[in-house]
Swiss-Prot record:
This is Evasin P1126. Salivary chemokine-binding protein which binds to host chemokines CXCL1, CXCL2, CXCL3, CXCL4, CXCL5, CXCL6, CXCL7, CXCL10 and CXCL11. It comes from Amblyomma cajennense. Keywords: Disulfide bond, Glycoprotein, Secreted, Signal. Residues 1-25 form the signal peptide.
Length: 90
């Protein structure tokens, strides 16, 4: 009788572990809490580039964005972004 109980517990454990593995291995679908279709962040490229190391900056209203170790960056107008500021604002 003891072996019968052990087999039942082992089968239950295998099914439980398999269920947990299946649930964790599937990608979770994240839903937006904000149902609006308007984007709060709408970056537009400005017609210029920037090189901060040579003190070549973007015009007013545009922000310099560099990728990795590149010397030259692209200027973007960040419409609708209220979190931009200089590091000294912290």
């Amino acid at each position: 009788m003891t072996s019968h109980s052990a087999v039942r517990i082992a089968i239950f454990a295998v099914i439980a572990l398999h269920s947990i593995f299946e649930c964790l291995s599937k990608p979770q679908i994240l839903q937006r809490t904000d149902k609006s279709t308007d984007s709060e962040w709408d970056p537009q490229t400005c017609p210029e580039t920037c090189i901060p190391s040579k003190n070549i900056t973007c015009s007013d209203g545009c922000v310099c964005v560099k990728l990795g170790e590149e010397e030259e960056g692209t200027c973007f107008n960040m419409t609708g972004v209220d979190w931009l500021g200089s590091p000294s604002d912290d």
